[in-house]
């Protein structure tokens, strides 16, 4: 039997989640690799799926969980064999396909990455899509020319999963990190992660209305979007760029073209869903090499499947700090 957290939709369109045992025959056949899932995690997108928001889930009943890691049970694909430790994220797993909140899953070989040496399944889910996206953003910004001597790098929404990991990784690479948060009580936490100073959300929302401001940021990892992203664009230095990856502060913004014309700034869209396998492997290897395990452990908390629904709401309410690891067998 397979233990799974299943979300159902009622006749009035409300959704509810419950833990059930299902037969292996009830698991959708989404690919040639069968995985015994050990760990998953909780991201903002998981919170949306658990609560029937964002039009992400197409059909019910549904198993959310956009991340998973475990051991291959069987494989009909070249290059992946029974016993391999693997992780899977992206490609709409947990959204339009059943995801990681179950003890079994399957997927196509091109969605699955064998874990680098020294990275356990639990370690990988302390990172999950959040850590993956943080490293992806840094590599993209550096490919665009960002360097540690090019000025401070702003991380917005720094208390969340992506922001927390990005703060650690940037500081480890020698950047001066300004961490923006709306929660003053986590300032010490962000400083411990490597932030050189704290910027309040209110400060970033206090927009003077000018089309362009003094150049402050050599780069930015923006996890929130909305008018905060518009403000960041005004404050980028010449040739600076912002990696845009979230919309918790809004999906639209009112921005001027002046910084693009006079400073040559860039907005780099970060799509972690459809990254090709070679690049996915590169990102996971970089995470294994650079993210300190002790720091990651300190910023992570483990829960069981029975707590996932509650934490899905908490992450939407901005009440989750750092990373949440889900032990699907717990």
Predicted regions and their residues:
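Glycine-rich beta-strand-centered segment in the early N-terminal region that forms part
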Residues: 26-42, 53-93
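Residue-level marker of beta-strand positions
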Residues: 32, 84-85, 104, 152, ...
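NAD(P)H dinucleotide-binding glycine-rich loop of Rossmann-like/cofactor-binding domains
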Residues: 89-154
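Short, glycine/polar-rich helix-capping loops at beta-to-alpha or helix-loop-helix junctions
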Residues: 101, 182-189, 251-257
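Glycine-rich NAD(P) Rossmann-fold beta1-alpha1 loop
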Residues: 131, 157-164, 225
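Adenosine-nucleotide cofactor-binding segment
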Residues: 171-227, 285
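Glycine-rich phosphate-binding loop and adjacent beta-alpha segment
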Residues: 227-293, 328-329
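C-terminal hydrophobic helical "lid"/dimerization subdomain
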Residues: 281-330
């Amino acid at each position: 039997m397979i233990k799974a957290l299943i979300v159902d939709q009622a006749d009035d369109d409300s959704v509810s989640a419950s833990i059930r045992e299902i037969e292996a025959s009830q698991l959708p056949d989404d690919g040639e690799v069968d995985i015994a899932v050990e760990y998953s995690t909780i991201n903002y997108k998981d919170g949306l799926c658990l609560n029937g928001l964002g039009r992400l889930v197409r059909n019910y009943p549904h198993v959310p969980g956009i991340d998973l890691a475990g051991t291959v049970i069987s494989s009909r694909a070249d290059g992946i064999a029974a016993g391999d430790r693997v992780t899977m994220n992206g490609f709409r797993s947990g959204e339009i396909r059943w995801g990681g909140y179950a003890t079994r899953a399957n997927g196509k070989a091109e969605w699955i990455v064998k874990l680098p040496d020294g990275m356990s399944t639990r370690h990988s889910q302390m990172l999950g899509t959040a850590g993956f996206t943080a490293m992806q953003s840094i590599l993209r910004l550096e490919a665009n020319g960002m360097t540690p001597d090019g000025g401070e790098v702003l991380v917005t929404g720094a208390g969340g999963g992506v922001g927390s990991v990005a703060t650690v990784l940037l500081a480890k690479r020698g950047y001066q990190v300004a961490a923006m948060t709306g929660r003053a009580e986590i300032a010490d936490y962000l400083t411990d992660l490597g932030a050189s100073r704290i910027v309040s959300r209110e400060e970033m929302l206090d927009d003077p209305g000018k089309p362009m401001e003094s150049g402050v940021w050599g780069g930015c990892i923006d996890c929130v979007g909305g008018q905060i992203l518009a403000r960041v664009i005004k404050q980028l230095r010449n040739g600076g760029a912002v990696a845009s990856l979230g919309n918790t502060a809004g999906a639209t913004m009112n921005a001027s073209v002046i910084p693009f014309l006079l400073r040559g700034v860039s907005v780099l869209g970060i799509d972690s869903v459809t990254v090709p396998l070679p690049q996915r492997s590169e990102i996971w290897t970089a995470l294994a090499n650079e993210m300190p395990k002790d720091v990651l452990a300190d910023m992570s908390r483990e829960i069981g499947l029975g707590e996932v629904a509650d934490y899905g709401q908490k992450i939407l309410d901005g009440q989750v700090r750092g990373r949440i690891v889900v032990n699907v067998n717990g």
